[in-house]
Amino acid sequence: MNRRDFLRRMTLVGIGAALFPFFPDAAEASWYIPSALPGVTIKPTYLSFGALENRFVTDCIVIHHIGNTNADVSAATVHEWHLHNGWAGIGYHFLVRKDGTIEEGRPMGTVGAHVYGENRHTVGINIVGNFEDAVPTEAQKHSAAHLIAALCTVYQLDPIWGVTVKGHRDFNATACPGRYLYAELPEIVEEARVYYGSDELQTERLRIMQQERAEQEQQRARMRTRMEAAQNKNGRPS
C-alpha cells in the first residue's frame, strides 16, 4: 500500500478526518518542522551553534561521507571540526554512525553547510566513513534508508534516486560520498521507497501528528487560562 492509499483509507475510517487538517500541504511541508521524525530514532547531541538561518524550501536530500577518515566519528567531533573552520557548527543535519545510530547535527529546519550553492533547499545526511576505500555497514545502509523515508514523509517528497535524493558529487566537483557508497545509493533509496509506503511508517506519522495536535490544544488552553486570569485581575476594583 502506498502513502496516498494509506491516508485515503485512514480518512474513510474516520482517523484521517480528525487528523488530516494538521498535515501540512505541499507548500507548508517544505518548511514544516515536526516534533519528531516518524519511524526513526534520532540521538540528541545538544550542540551549541552560532547564528543559523531557517530553511523555507526543502526539495532534496544530499548524501555525504566523512572522507578524510574511515573512523567512527561522532557528530560532536565533526561539530568541532566545522567550528574550527569558522562555521556556525556542524554543517550536516544528521550523521549515521557505523552501528546505524542516527545522530542529530544542525537543526533540521535550518540552512545547512554541506553542499556549496545548494544549502537553502536541501537536507544533508553524512554516513560516517571514507567510502573511496571502504564500504558502508549494513546497519548504516538500513538506518540511512529509514531516515530518507522519514524525511520524505515529512517534506512530502517521493524518494527517487537522482531526483529527491542525490550524492554530494551530483552538485559539486567532489568525490563525496565516495565511490563505494555512491554505487549503493540506488539500492538504499529503493529500500527507503519500500519503507515510505509501509503502514508502519504512516501509522507512526499519524501518531506524531495526533500528539502534536494534543500539545497545541493544551497550549491554547493554558493561554486562555492566563488571559482570563489577567482579565479578571484587571477587572477587579482597586
Regions found by a protein language model. Give the residues of each.
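Conserved beta-strand segments that form the floor/walls of ligand-binding pockets within enzyme
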Residues: 95, 124-126
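Basic/polar, cationic surfaces and motifs that engage anionic cell-wall
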Residues: 2, 8-11, 19-22, 26-58, ...
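Short, conserved "active-site rim" segments that organize catalytic pockets and cofactor/ligand binding
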Residues: 47-108
